Curated annotation (Swiss-Prot):
One of its GO terms (cellular component) is cytosol. Keywords: Aminoacyl-tRNA synthetase, ATP-binding, Coiled coil, Cytoplasm, Ligase, Nucleotide-binding, Protein biosynthesis. SUPFAM superfamilies: Anticodon-binding domain of a subclass of class I aminoacyl-tRNA synthetases, Nucleotidylyl transferase, tRNA-binding arm, ValRS/IleRS/LeuRS editing domain. It is an enzyme of class 6 (ligase). This is Valine--tRNA ligase. GO terms for molecular function: aminoacyl-tRNA deacylase activity; ATP binding; valine-tRNA ligase activity. Pfam families: Anticodon_1 (PF08264), tRNA-synt_1 (PF00133), Val_tRNA-synt_C (PF10458). Belongs to the class-I aminoacyl-tRNA synthetase family. ValS type 1 subfamily. Its EC number is 6.1.1.9. Residues 809-846 form a coiled coil. ATP binds at residue 528.
Amino acid sequence: MEEQHSMPTKYDPSATEKKWYTYWLKGKFFEATGDPDKQPYSIVIPPPNVTGKLHLGHAWDATIQDILARTKRMQGYDTLWLPGMDHAGIATQAKVEGKLREQGISKYDLGREAFLEKSWEWKDEYAKFIREQWAKVGISVDYSRERFTLDQGLSDAVKEVFVSLYNKGLIYRGEYIINWDPQTKTALSDIEVIYKDVQGAFYHMSYPLSDGSGSIEIATTRPETMLGDTAVAVHPDDERYQHLIGKMVKLPIVGREIPIIADDYVDREFGSGAVKITPAHDPNDFEIGNRHNLPRVLVMNEDGTMNEKAGKYEGMDRFECRKQIVKDLQAQQVLFKIEDHLHSVGHSERSGAVVEPYLSTQWFVKMRPLAEEALKLQEYADTKVTFVPQRFEQTYIRWMENIRDWCISRQLWWGHQIPAWYHKETNEIYVGKEPPRDSENWRQDEDVLDTWFSSALWPFSTMGWPDEEAPDYKRYYPTNVLVTGYDIIAFWVSRMIFQGKAFTGQRPFKDVLIHGLIRDAEGRKMSKSLGNGVDPQEVIDKYGADSLRFFLATGSTPGNDLRFYWEKVESTWNFGNKIWNASRFALMNMDGFSYSDIDINQEKSIADKWILTRLQETVESVTRLIDAYEFGEAGRVLYSFIWDDVCDWYIEMAKLALYGENEQAKQATRSVLAHVLDQTMRMLHPFMPFITEEIWQHLPHEGESITVANWPVYDQSLVFEEAVEDMEALKSLIHAIRTTRSELNVPMSKQIELKIRPQDEQMAARLQRGVAYIEKFANPSLLDIAVDLATPEKAMSHALSGMELFLPLAGMLDLDKEVARLEKELDKLNKEVERIEKKLNNQGFLAKAPSHVVEEEKAKQQDYAAKRQTVIERIAELKA
């Protein structure tokens, strides 16, 4: 697009953002080209669930990736940022079932096929919604390559992996204790269980010996499971019970006889040293049961109610059963103590239901061999996955070293149906990518795979694998970086690494960049229950996407949590306005000035040379920091350069040339200003894409879009050390003069005398070169610069680097009047200090006032004391 030299008075994000995102998509600027002359760079987006709105965490995650994608694209890489979404088995099915319930329909009323049709309708609706939200944030993904975890290509990959692992003996079907969600009636993997501290009880009871010779004491937090007890275990070396090993006890209520067994697992020091063994309802008891060939008595149904094995409790909810059993045990006088007990209880991550350890036949991945192979990648620099920050590598390694087999079957309809069939007559199992040829004689397993099974294949399945000749797979895999939160290192990162190693022979990504969680201003995790969540759309509507993005990018360091403050988003909005106004000023002084007129090699002023040098330093720093994933620091460097160097200093100094009569100086400054703004907008673009595109299109420029403009490169020929030294001297001098004017209430419009004593002739020459700037910024009536300058009487003095500054007070202000004003101010400050000291010496106040109020008073005391000291010193100077 051609530049337009007039800009609106105010920046309007709502109009600008939609315009430019549409323009970018139409121009296909985000699409990877496969250009063999360019080096590939790839990222796959962590696929959001098709269950609803994206939250601030998604916006943060996406902003970080977009900074990388936009930067690399501008640096000339063939950049692929591949988008997609996750089918999110349990979560989506629960949402669809909930929607059906509102219409009085259950999934069973519809049947599997019709229910899946409804689920796909849900997916299509929410996928569109997610794309709209991505557009609002401004992310530069390649929509032409968008994938979904249930699309055909990914389904083929899932089948390939399942069948391969099964044939290698790494997927098996067996009866084990699994985590069971009675609400959704499905198995859960260990990392889908959230542990919460719950106030419960220890129930101490005695099981009578069958021979009537006594009893043995046991304790449990789940008395309802005693109905499934098949033994009592003691430690073989526990002298208290050695004479009882092999004897039988009679199970209260049930009346079933069960043995007392010896097992090393039992902790002699815990409780009575004897434990009830329920192999069908506890994972440790299950292992003990296997060692001792104990029967497995399952006493619950899948919905958490008691089954026929529970006898008279059949049909009762498990927790109601617990209450009734306690009453019945008390009636039998075998329950002799109930002890309060705070313990950690597993809850379903999705439904919130208390998870039940449950005996069930499920499909599992044998994890130990896969984990060991994945960990070998970390042994060599050219194969390892680099974690940023590095400390998270240990989180990953610890998880993999202590990993348990992964339960991958889920009792759902929405998901990848397990590619296993059972012969209707022989019950033979067939596992394959295609159904058996005589499919009428077989029934397919009704369960689906854990959502994370397909997500674990995301980096390579999205690139066309298992076709290893697929162009995208050959060019863009392995990917360069994965950006994700520390909370899913175990859930997702570890699984992608072991599947990547198992099926592609290499790491799925070179780096893993870990960020934290977004919290509210008080440091609390955002949640529905606290009502402290913030919708990114609300932020964008109020301040624009760029303000939100810049806040998210600069608000934290890698691996750490980010606190959300509306005030900080507002400050980034102010930053955007500062950039806008600076650009408007520049364009107002560029009438008739085009891109071809830019010439930064002509004679330049000190300010021109200084800002070009600062630009090179900023280019070097920002590029290095982005490469190191230090986006916060990169943003702060840009902020300081734009706000302080460009806006507060250079633009003000540029006015000397722009408003002057020297046409050559005017053209040089125009060139430098245009160049600096162009290069600055390019560096800022990955952080704030919309406003930078809008400004860049108005500036003299070349090319269709800043999105594909070249990234700035450090240029040593534009570094002017002498100009930097000149400017540092001038800035410190001007700052000291402005500070003195402010302290003495002398307005800038009032001319004052300035006397400067440089320490040597070199500094004197430096100041003489900058006289025009001193006169503009200091407004002197007299400017005297001399190495042999005599110290004037009655003058404010400042010892600066390489010089002394004197501001004669005569003519600058009425000394007597100023002293009187300061003494009046001192009197007020003395009274305030006295009032606060009296309050802080009052024991009643200290005892009753909240601690934060006391701290506020102490802070005021220090503030007033510091102000008082400054006024005392100022009075002394004026009287001297």
